[in-house]
Amino acid sequence: KSLFPRNLISKHWDIYPDNFKKSLFNSDKIKNFRSNDLSFKFNDSLEKGMLLRTKRALEKLTKITGREFIEKNKETMIGNPKTFYIDNEYYDYHDLFIIYFYHSLVSFLSEKRDKEIFFVCEIGGGYGGLIHRIKKNFPGAVCLLFDLPEQNYISNYYLKQLNPKAKVLNLESLMSMKKTKSLDSMKIERDDLKKFDYVILPGYLIEKIHNSFIDIFINTRSFMEMNLETVYFYFSE
């Protein structure tokens, strides 16, 4: 975290105390992160009065996608989310929104399906719920996540729990692979990443992507939570 430029952390996300890693590295808390403070601010299900809101969200989403699409793409197990039993099935409010976002992207992702490998980059992906759907349905996608270190730790846990055999590249393994102890002159090339399923890195390293090879960039809502300097940084890259 000490490497992350302070000017790229907005007030909205400057919420983690110095001792937060004690909670983050607590095995019981990480197993239940979708029902505790570890997912604060990137999990709408933690809000109060969620039963009625979940019913309404399910009803609206069903009209858009159909119930079969929801059942195929929901994920209500990892992280012990706060679910509600509706119409003989369990649903998580935040999960329904992720399904909506995924449904909105399917047509764009399908355009890349014929490529053996294509690169999808999500900025501010939270615990990895959306990128999981993308990888599940489009196995040829190499999925990049750029976010704060705390979220990266949680998304790494979440995605590995869903797919223990997934090949994940993080900052430590990237530096080892590039045989460097310094980030200053590092360049991230297409060939560095093509053998991985997930690449999970701190947001500021997006500027190290060399000879832009990303096929699809995604940001669902976190740009509105960033300061203008941070938004400009991402758009300039």
What do these predicted ranges mean?
Residues 225-236:
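A short, conserved alpha-helix within the catalytic core of class I
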Residues 127-138:
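Conserved SAM-binding loop of SAM-dependent methyltransferases across substrates and taxa
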Residues 218:
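A conserved beta-strand element that flanks and buttresses the S-adenosyl-L-methionine
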Residues 2-113:
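Conserved Class I S-adenosyl-L-methionine-dependent methyltransferase catalytic core
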Residues 115-126:
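Conserved class I S-adenosyl-L-methionine
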Residues 158-210:
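S-adenosyl-L-methionine
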Residues 142-148:
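Conserved SAM-binding motif I beta-strand of class I
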Residues 118, 197, 214-215:
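Conserved acidic residues
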